[in-house]
Amino acid sequence: MATVNQLVRKPRVRKVIKSNVPALGKSPQKRGVCTRVYTTTPKKPNSALRKVCRVRLTNGFEVTAYIGGEGHNLQEHSVILIRGGRVKDLPGVRYHIVRGSLDCAGVKERKQGRSKYGVKKPKK
C-alpha cells in the first residue's frame, strides 16, 4: 500500500486500452466510398481468393474492409457502411462491410443467417 506522500509524488496511472478499430472512433459504423475492389490470398495454411476493398471513410481514414458472403455488387465509388471485426487470416483487414445497406446489396438466395447478410425474410 502506497503512502499519501508517495501518491503525491507519483500518482497511480490508469491503463490505456488501445482500440482494435481506430478508424471508427467511438461510432458503431462509418460510411465510406470504395476506392479499390480486389481479391487477396489468406495466410498459411488457408487458401482462397478473399474479396476485399479499400475504403475512404467520411472522417478521412483509408482502410481495408472485407466483403462477406457469396457474390457482391461493389465497384469503385460505391458508397458503403463498415463495421468493426477483423478477418483472422487476412493481415491488415480489421473491418467488415455491412451487407444490405447503402450501395451494397444483400446476398442472393440466402435462407439461413440472413440478418448478417442483409436479406429480407422470404415470402411463403
Curated annotation (Swiss-Prot):
The modification 3-methylthioaspartic acid is found at D89. Belongs to the universal ribosomal protein uS12 family. The keyword rRNA-binding applies. This is Small ribosomal subunit protein uS12. It holds the Pfam family Ribosom_S12_S23. Keywords: Methylation, Ribonucleoprotein, Ribosomal protein, RNA-binding, rRNA-binding, tRNA-binding. GO terms for biological process: translation. GO terms for cellular component: small ribosomal subunit. The lineage of its organism: Bacteria, Pseudomonadati, Pseudomonadota, Gammaproteobacteria, Enterobacterales. It comes from Buchnera aphidicola subsp. Acyrthosiphon pisum (strain APS). GO terms for molecular function: rRNA binding; structural constituent of ribosome; tRNA binding. With S4 and S5 plays an important role in translational accuracy. The keyword Ribonucleoprotein applies. InterPro entries: NA-bd_OB-fold, Ribosomal_uS12, Ribosomal_uS12_bac. Part of the 30S ribosomal subunit. Contacts proteins S8 and S17. May interact with IF1 in the 30S initiation complex.
